[in-house]
Design a protein with these regions (language model features):
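N-terminal cap/lid segment of alpha/beta-hydrolase-fold proteins
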Residues: 1-17
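Active-site glycine-rich loops that stabilize anionic/oxyanionic intermediates
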Residues: 27-33
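Conserved alpha/beta-hydrolase
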Residues: 42-68
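Alpha/beta-hydrolase fold nucleophile elbow
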Residues: 97-108
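Active-site nucleophile loop of the alpha/beta-hydrolase fold
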Residues: 128-132
Length: 132
């Protein structure tokens, strides 16, 4: 796993070690979750030729600054910011891996974040929505 930062976003990169990478899956987790809850899915995707690139959404996982910020995206325009975070990650990933197909897996709240991106006509190859 690589860990990069984009402003205050922690970007987790779980890269497949298979000889032929098939695409990239961006995981958008649910409320009160974090990317660590998806290790089983990340492992399965990596073993099947997919890179996984994700973040803990604002107020979740490693992005909790204090107990008061748990689950809080921002004091203003939080939803727009969390949607923009994911869009920025996907846009940057397209530049880094221009030939690979991009997919989003969104669970619960994460599925609504993914749908918000879909409304903006985000250029991705597919989307899986869970618990929507």
């Amino acid at each position: 796993m690589n860990l990069n930062t984009l402003n205050d976003n922690y970007i987790y990169k779980y890269l497949s070690s298979t000889s032929e990478v098939r695409g990239i899956v961006h995981i958008s987790h649910g409320k009160a979750e974090h990317i660590g809850r998806y290790k089983w899915l990340i492992s399965m995707l990596n073993n099947n030729g997919y890179h996984v690139i994700s973040i803990d959404h604002r107020g979740h996982g490693n992005r909790i600054n204090n107990k008061r910020s748990i689950g809080i995206f921002s004091n203003s325009f939080g939803w727009k910011k969390v949607v923009k975070d994911l869009k920025t990650i996907i846009d940057n990933t397209k530049k880094e891996y221009p030939t690979l197909k991009q997919y989003i897996f969104g669970h619960s709240m994460g599925s609504w974040i993914a749908l918000s991106l879909f409304k903006e006509r985000l250029d991705i190859s597919g989307m899986i929505l869970s618990g929507s």
